[in-house]
Amino acid sequence: MVRTRIQRLLTGINRRMMKLLIALALIAYVASVWGNFVNMSKSIQENGEQKMEKKIEEVIAPLREKIQNLERSFTQKYPPVKFLSEKDRKRILITGGAGFVGSHLTDKLMMDGHEVTVVDNFFTGRKRNVEHWIGHENFELINHDVVEPLYIEVDQIYHLASPASPPNYMYNPIKTLKTNTIGTLNMLGLAKRVGARLLLASTSEVYGDPEVHPQSEEYWGHVNPIGPRACYDEGKRVAETMCYAYMKQEGVEVRVARIFNTFGPRMHMNDGRVVSNFILQALQGEQLTVYGSGEQTRAFQYVSDLVNGLVALMNSNVSSPVNLGNPQEHSIVQFARLIKQLVGSGGEISFLSEAQDDPQRRKPDIRKAKLLLGWEPVVPLEEGLNKTIHYFRKELEHQANNQYIPKPKPARVKKGRTRHN
């Protein structure tokens, strides 16, 4: 009986041990599963964190680059600027200051130590033409259309705002007229209010297809008032008239520069004028297109010469119109051959039908500028062309990554084509 009880006790103990062992095994299994789960969760978490870190890095990288660019811009070195005393330093407004000529004028006046405000609506101007001055304490850039009034305190106004290439002003003749009339009226009103001197950037186009050669300032011109280019030619003529009306009636100090063909870096490659057309065609190995016989003549000045002339005229006592141009005359076909030679490539010269209202000869008489301003062009034609060709090459490289560069074509108008500007 005692044995039976002992056996039952051992059996109970065995069952309890078995249950305990099973429980321990179950606990071990659960612990193992939990460990695997924890490890898996940890792995997933680590992978998730890595992915999250990668995504965060993708977002942060461009922001970091922008911050670095901003830091560089704060410490960037501007072109050397002269120091002028308060008495000598002028507050100067340049309308169209982000354009081809305007941006070079901006460089000149900034480096001379003046405070320069550039106003441009970027119809043809480009911010990158003046971006190297952004942030400088003497420089300000305003996005503004001169057909709207502008209120600003200045000492001098260089009024350059206007489309100047045939495709641009033929594309929007009304805007061209408004800029040259309403815009000029607004700038004259500003000059009257603040007592500033205004220089109008007029053009040799006021002479039209001249019957006098070379053209002096006394020549009244031969202009077609309803031709495809009349919006620009007549717009500048009426702008001159308004300047002298304000000078006579309101006592506004005005200067008028009649600018002849000008070229240089920052020209638009596709602006439709002869220099940009020929250089672009030669660099791309295409035929150089000449309209008419090619015997038409032009006189080309480099942009730095023009800028020096504008500054000299503004600071002079000469209130009557002054021609600013290079009196060295070249035929269009000679010019095409020269560019082809300097580029070292390009196709043959092709001749197309002559454009409407294309002046046969154009050459400035600059005796007045020589006598009264002590100014004349000094940059040789080939030197200026080589600088311009180098700039165009860089532009083509800059835009080469699958960007389309339109081939130079004349603007489409109802009658005729663009002329050899």
Curated annotation (Swiss-Prot):
Transmembrane segments: 20-40
One Pfam match: UXS1_N
Stretches the record annotates as Disordered: 400-421
Biological processes, Gene Ontology terms: D-xylose metabolic process; UDP-D-xylose biosynthetic process
Assembly and binders: Homodimer and homotetramer.
EC number(s) on file: 4.1.1.35
Enzyme class: lyase
GO function terms (MF aspect): NAD+ binding; UDP-glucuronate decarboxylase activity
Subcellular location: Golgi apparatus, Golgi stack membrane
First-listed, main subcellular location of the protein, grouped into a coarse class: Golgi
Binding site for NAD(+): 99-101, 120-121, 123-125, 145-146, 160, 162, 179, 201, 232, 236, 262, 268, 273
Cytoplasmic-facing ranges: 1-19
Catalytic reactions on record: UDP-alpha-D-glucuronate + H(+) = UDP-alpha-D-xylose + CO2
Gene: uxs1
Glycosyltransferase recorded as keyword: no
Stated role: Catalyzes the NAD-dependent decarboxylation of UDP-glucuronic acid to UDP-xylose. Necessary for the biosynthesis of the core tetrasaccharide in glycosaminoglycan biosynthesis.
PANTHER family, per database record: UDP-GLUCURONIC ACID DECARBOXYLASE 1, UDP-GLUCURONIC ACID DECARBOXYLASE-RELATED
Organism from which the protein derives: Xenopus tropicalis (Western clawed frog)
Name of the protein in question: UDP-glucuronic acid decarboxylase 1
GO cellular component, one term: Golgi cisterna membrane
Binding annotation for UDP-alpha-D-glucuronate: L150, Y151, K178, N186, G189, K192, R193, Y246, Q249, E250
Topological relation to the membrane, as annotated: Single-pass type II membrane protein
Pathway(s) served: Nucleotide-sugar biosynthesis; UDP-alpha-D-xylose biosynthesis; UDP-alpha-D-xylose from UDP-alpha-D-glucuronate: step 1/1
